Amino acid sequence: MDINAYMREVGSEARSASRLIAKADTGVKNKALIATAEAIDAAREELMAANAKDLESGRANGLDAALLDRLELTPARIDAMIKGLHQVAALPDPVGEITGLNYRPSGIQVGKMRVPLGVVGIIYESRPNVTVEAASLCLKSGNATILRGGSEAIHSNQAIAACIENGLKTAGLPASVVQVIKTTDRAAVGELITMPDYVDVIVPRGGKGLIERISREARVPVIKHLDGVCHVFIDRDADLNKALTIAVNSKTQRYGTCNTMETLLVDAPVAATILPQLAQAYAEKGVELRGCERTREILPQALSAVEADWSEEYLAPILAIKVVENLDEAIAHINHYGSHHTDAIVTESYSKGRRFLTEVDSSSVMINASTRFADGFEYGLGAEIGISTDKIHARGPVGLEGLTSQKYVVLGDGHIRQ
């Protein structure tokens, strides 16, 4: 297969489809989403059979247990895909919304209209349910989509793609609105991220290596985050009961997510009081502690933290702990070592909370809440295509609105500029 020619054809079809889906009304888009859900429900056996092929290949190729778990399509995960499609169909359609319309001294009205981005390329690994999540959000926001899943999920993704095509057909939309790349050749990724004539934005979802490569080589804008090095800072003015529950939940509710706390910062005046309680709670959960020298004076059972620990995304039951002198040191540490993802302060001081919100340079900053809330669903977005730590266009969880941009609209009645 000539990968360059194949990807150019896919891109050309996506560009044409983007003009159709951009002007599709909400009812048509919702019809496609519901029909896709019905097609998935009717194709459960086919989906499970295709997934079984991928799992068999994965085991033969030595995929570890975590990757195999992400790859597996269980009945519950199929149920979740169906539920997700219905949820996206129920979300308000952002396309065409006009905001900020106001009269200017000249008599014209000026406002902003929300419009689709155009063609969105999604590159992801392992999890076949991302195929449905990404396709549904792009479809509802009026974008055409090119999906390139991991080679380990090729059979699952193609089976899901057939269901999506069925849903599009039912709604009278062309299959090219959502295209799933049919080759496992890695050269397809290189082509996809270097086609600015056909692709408007790339959203990578996967490991740090994949995202670094795409960020380095892409010739189209990328919506991404590299790491989730999230912090909780327990201030001297914190309610220590709140601090205990927030610090435990932020770390142990789930270990493998990008919004899990990886470093705990504790204000020196409360360290001797709160750290032993936290250590006991973490021990019950099997969490390994790595602390600075001052932490180890209080918790001698903790391992010695090294410089690399402060910027490490463990995605595991491991936690770095540092005792800091004050809020200034906590903010400086977060801005230096953090990944600009999600950081929280536990404090009863209004002024310190406001300083934290203002000075911590992250896409989500929190007061007295677990970092695990950094999620599109929890933020009321309904669903998310990913989380961005960039500052341009989308920042934080990216939902339907993040898959659109705005253009100015000007309304006049024969007005001319004097």
From Swiss-Prot:
GO molecular function annotations of the record: glutamate-5-semialdehyde dehydrogenase activity; NADP binding
Keyword Amino-acid biosynthesis: yes
Subcellular location: Cytoplasm
Cited SUPFAM superfamilies: ALDH-like
Protein origin, superkingdom: Bacteria
One BP term from GO: L-proline biosynthetic process
Name of the protein in question: Gamma-glutamyl phosphate reductase
Enzyme Commission number(s): 1.2.1.41
Top EC class for this record: oxidoreductase
Keywords: Amino-acid biosynthesis, Cytoplasm, NADP, Oxidoreductase, Proline biosynthesis
Listed GO CC annotations: cytoplasm
Taxonomic source organism: Hahella chejuensis (strain KCTC 2396)
Pathway: Amino-acid biosynthesis; L-proline biosynthesis; L-glutamate 5-semialdehyde from L-glutamate: step 2/2
UniProt catalytic activity: L-glutamate 5-semialdehyde + phosphate + NADP(+) = L-glutamyl 5-phosphate + NADPH + H(+)
Membership in a protein family: Belongs to the gamma-glutamyl phosphate reductase family.
Chain's role: Catalyzes the NADPH-dependent reduction of L-glutamate 5-phosphate into L-glutamate 5-semialdehyde and phosphate. The product spontaneously undergoes cyclization to form 1-pyrroline-5-carboxylate.
CDD domains recorded: ALDH_F18-19_ProA-GPR
